């Protein structure tokens, strides 16, 4: 049984969010929740919400036992990019790319 949860259009760079996804992939859910709770990265808070949602989905929709769940997949895809301008000297401008992520966490039986 595989149950997933997704947070689309998260305002964080995929490169930064993937660092946190790599920490919890393959771990059991109790360990993953503790890792995210003690991580000081912004992405860990977003990933924690998605993980808790996936756990709740497994418990309520599938009747799964929380103690037997493990994080089978955790990945971050790139969403649309917001393009902004920063004014520079002599009437020029530089482009700023505000990157957006789609975070997906899948939990399943051990």
Curated annotation (Swiss-Prot):
UniProt keyword annotation of Ribosomal protein present: yes
Keywords: Ribonucleoprotein, Ribosomal protein, RNA-binding, rRNA-binding
GO biological process annotation, one example: translation
GO molecular function: rRNA binding; structural constituent of ribosome
Gene Ontology CC annotations of this record: cytosolic large ribosomal subunit
Any Pfam family the entry gives: Ribosomal_L22
Family of this protein: Belongs to the universal ribosomal protein uL22 family.
Oligomeric form and interacting partners: Part of the 50S ribosomal subunit.
Function: This protein binds specifically to 23S rRNA; its binding is stimulated by other ribosomal proteins, e.g. L4, L17, and L20. It is important during the early stages of 50S assembly. It makes multiple contacts with different domains of the 23S rRNA in the assembled 50S subunit and ribosome.
NCBIfam families, per the entry: rplV_bact (TIGR01044)
Protein name, UniProt field: Large ribosomal subunit protein uL22
Phylogenetic lineage: Bacteria, Pseudomonadati, Pseudomonadota, Gammaproteobacteria, Thiotrichales
């Amino acid at each position: 049984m595989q149950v997933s949860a997704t947070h689309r259009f998260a305002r964080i760079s995929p490169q930064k969010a993937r660092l946190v996804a790599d920490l919890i992939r393959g771990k059991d859910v109790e360990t993953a929740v503790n890792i995210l709770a003690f991580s000081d990265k912004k992405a860990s808070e977003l990933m924690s919400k998605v993980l808790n949602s996936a756990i709740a989905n497994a418990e309520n929709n599938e009747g799964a036992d929380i103690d037997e769940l493990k994080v089978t997949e955790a990945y971050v895809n790139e969403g649309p990019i917001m393009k902004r301008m920063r004014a520079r000297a002599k009437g020029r401008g530089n482009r700023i790319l505000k990157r957006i992520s789609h975070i997906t966490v899948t939990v399943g039986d051990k």
